Amino acid sequence: LNIISLSSLSMLVREKDEERALKYIDQLSYTFRYLSQNGANTSFIALREEIKFAEAYSYLYKIRYADKIAFDFDIDEKYLDHKLPPISLQPLIGNAVKHNAISSKRLFRVRIYTDNGYLVVANNKFPMLEPNPGTGLGLTNLNSRYMLLLNREIEIINNEQEFIVRLPLVKQ
């Protein structure tokens, strides 16, 4: 995140795009602040806070990939005060980008929405020529946190067209 973020910021400065560079700095600092304040948090956070973080974090990717990537948020207001473990969306957004070939030939889309008490993250799949197998650690850790805090597993749906993760929300 650090090196990629600095490269994107450098690009904006070289392009003399002051407005976007300043917004990028704001979103980057918010992202780092959220991660540092909530990284050791073993309780819950309101969905509204996690979504605010996800919007800032996704902005960093939108600058890096320009018109090749889109993030769609559709959050029902009735769920904004529901809870989930903090930093649940970061590994899902990061994995979506990491495991797909993002190019100007087609739009890569990540949808984040609520559905019957779940927060859902879904992305279309564009396989890479040389797949990045990853370790699966991000999803494993996220599932472990849900089991520890909620005694519930996250739901993973992986088909040919889409990769979907459903996170249970807690009404408190």
Identify the residue ranges that each predicted region occupies:
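Two-component histidine phosphotransfer core
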Residues: 1-168
